[in-house]
Design a protein with these regions (language model features):
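Alpha-helical tetratricopeptide repeat
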Residues: 1-256
Length: 256
């Protein structure tokens, strides 16, 4: 069955369930369809209604799917390991029907995991996830912010700001869009201020501004590498050679 056929089959099961609420055969079929669509908790809720009780074998696929999704959510929240999130999502997706796309929530989680990894390839993968979601709905604020964050991590701050603003035009109350828009704008402003001090030979003020800019988003390796290079040039003009060397070393560690 195609994904749309699974949705149709689910609606048929719901209609049958309304007519005969305790029909175990209907409930088993409904639970299997929910699982095939990636709606594991709904499947488990249906299994709980079945009398006599559904067997462990019947429930195993939905339980494993829910366990892996919960693990992915927990790892996203409490760890910096994007690869562990991807592994959990891969395991969860094994329970989907072959013609069913992963749920939107899972795809956003995958994009978030790619952002956590922060490599050139993974940032491209995050962009691909966002673009796939935006092809389905160009006004998806979460997908717009996901793409904006990937662009920001790649140093494309102007494009990132455009995406955050577009997300806010879709949902003016979306806090993540506000958060990242303000952060990128603040960082750009401080970089420009530091560059202005450097241009006119105000090297101590430039060092101070660049130092403050490094505190705006410690996780953005690409941008912070550039700021460290700029601060290193200031230190060299001030003949603070060890500080200059230290910043160059740190910049290379962040962006080899």
């Amino acid at each position: 069955m195609s994904a749309s056929r699974y949705i149709d089959a689910l609606e048929d099961c719901k209609t049958a369930d309304d007519l005969d609420p305790n029909n175990a055969k209907v409930l088993h079929r409904m639970a299997k369809i929910y699982t095939s669509l990636g709606r594991a908790q709904e499947a488990l809720d249906v299994y709980d209604r079945i009398q006599p009780a559904a067997t462990a074998k019947d429930k195993a696929s939905a339980q494993n799917m829910q366990k892996n999704i919960s693990q992915a959510e927990d790892t996203l929240k409490n760890s910096n390991s994007g690869s562990m999130v991807l592994h959990a999502l891969d395991l969860a997706e094994k329970g989907l029907a072959s013609t069913v796309q992963p749920p939107r929530k899972w795809r956003l989680m995958r994009g978030e995991a790619y952002l956590k990894m922060g490599t050139v390839n993974s940032l491209g993968d995050a962009q691909n996830v966002a673009m796939s979601l935006l092809r389905n709905n160009s006004a998806d604020p979460e997908a717009l912010v996901l793409r904006g964050r990937a662009l920001y991590a790649q140093g494309e701050n102007e494009k990132a700001i455009q995406h955050f603003r577009q997300a806010l035009s879709c949902d003016p109350d979306y806090r993540e869009a506000v958060k990242y828009l303000r952060m990128v704008q603040k960082l750009d402003k401080m970089k420009e201020e530091g560059n202005g001090h450097f241009k006119y030979g105000r090297y101590p003020q430039a060092v101070e501004t660049y130092t403050s800019a490094l505190e705006v988003d410690p996780l953005n390796k690409g941008t912070n590498s550039k700021i460290l290079n700029n601060r290193a040039m200031c230190y060299s003009r001030l003949k603070q050679w060890q500080n200059a060397i230290g910043d160059c070393d740190r910049a290379l560690q962040l962006d080899p």
